[in-house]
């Protein structure tokens, strides 16, 4: 597989074309950002940890019947993925109250949500990824009603699979965001799944083991990521 020019550079990943029109290469960088890119730092080993963590999770989801864009690891910081036509919507599943939900509704952090909630946000950094609903997605042409049904179904399936996986590792899956795209007419899970895009707390101590350590200045960010990977059995 020949790596060609950079197609897109995000806050923490770069996307490259290949000699196959249906495949792209994702490069996980050490860049770590918060507050819609207003704060950016370099954290050693982060690209490698997130790349291998993402590969592990995507393979677990594939085994559970969730279609993903992941094909294979290419190295410590790179993987080969399917080229998706991305839907510009973030799907957020919450099992416990945290983050923007706490700020928006004034509820106490850590409350268990039963049932888990499903939310949509427009993927737009300039506008702060605003909270939207299903009718917005359809009315503005960001996706179809049928695609939304499938995205919600897959998001809840991911929650079912990963909640158990993390629970078995002594961790609470507090919340997470997913992005989807279309590959040959099928809705497929895209982007990544890593501690950058979810909240994970230790079951016993409620210690934060995710990107909130960076956002909140708690320190030991990569050490926490590596601890999560170790508990799951991710080969680093």
From Swiss-Prot:
Question: By what name is this protein known?
Answer: Phosphoribosylaminoimidazole-succinocarboxamide synthase
Its Gene Ontology biological processes? 'de novo' IMP biosynthetic process; cobalamin biosynthetic process
Give the catalysed reaction(s), semicolon-separated. Answer: 5-amino-1-(5-phospho-D-ribosyl)imidazole-4-carboxylate + L-aspartate + ATP = (2S)-2-[5-amino-1-(5-phospho-beta-D-ribosyl)imidazole-4-carboxamido]succinate + ADP + phosphate + 2 H(+)
In short, the EC number is 6.3.2.6
Enzyme category, top tier? ligase
**Organism the protein comes from:** Pseudomonas putida (strain ATCC 47054 / DSM 6125 / CFBP 8728 / NCIMB 11950 / KT2440)
The pathway this protein participates in, as annotated, is: Purine metabolism; IMP biosynthesis via de novo pathway; 5-amino-1-(5-phospho-D-ribosyl)imidazole-4-carboxamide from 5-amino-1-(5-phospho-D-ribosyl)imidazole-4-carboxylate: step 1/2
CDD domains the record matches: SAICAR_synt_PurC
UniProt keyword annotation of Magnesium present: no
Q: Which InterPro entries match?
A: SAICAR_synt/ADE2_N (IPR028923), SAICAR_synt_PurC (IPR033934), SAICAR_synth (IPR001636), SAICAR_synthetase (IPR050089), SAICAR_synthetase_CS (IPR018236)
| Keywords, ordered alphabetically | ATP-binding, Ligase, Nucleotide-binding, Purine biosynthesis
Tell me which GO cellular component terms the UniProt record holds: cytosol
What SUPFAM superfamilies is this protein classified in? Answer: SAICAR synthase-like (SSF56104)
The family assignment reads:
Belongs to the SAICAR synthetase family.
A GO molecular function annotation here is: ATP binding
């Amino acid at each position: 597989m020949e790596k060609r020019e950079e197609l897109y550079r995000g806050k923490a990943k770069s996307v490259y074309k290949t000699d196959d029109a249906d495949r792209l290469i994702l490069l996980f960088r050490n860049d770590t950002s918060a507050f819609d890119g207003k704060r950016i730092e370099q954290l050693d080993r982060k690209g490698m940890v997130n790349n291998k963590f993402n590969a592990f999770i995507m393979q677990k989801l594939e085994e559970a019947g969730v279609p993903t864009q992941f094909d294979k690891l290419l190295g410590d910081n790179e993987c080969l993925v399917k080229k998706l036509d991305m839907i510009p919507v973030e799907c957020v599943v919450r099992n416990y109250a945290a983050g923007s939900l706490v700020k928006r509704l004034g509820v106490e952090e850590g409350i268990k949500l039963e049932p888990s909630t499903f939310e949509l946000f427009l993927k737009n950094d300039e506008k702060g990824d605003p909270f939207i609903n299903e009718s917005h997605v359809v009315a503005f042409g960001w996706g179809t009603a049928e695609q939304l049904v499938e995205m919600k179904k897959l998001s809840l399936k991911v929650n079912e699979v990963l909640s158990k996986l993390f629970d078995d590792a002594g961790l609470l899956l507090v919340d997470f965001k997913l992005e989807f795209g279309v590959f040959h007419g099928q809705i497929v899970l895209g982007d990544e799944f890593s501690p950058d895009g979810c909240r994970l707390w230790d079951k016993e101590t409620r210690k934060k083991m995710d990107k909130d350590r960076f956002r909140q200045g708690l320190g030991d960010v990569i050490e926490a990521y590596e601890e999560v990977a170790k508990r799951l059995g991710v080969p680093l």
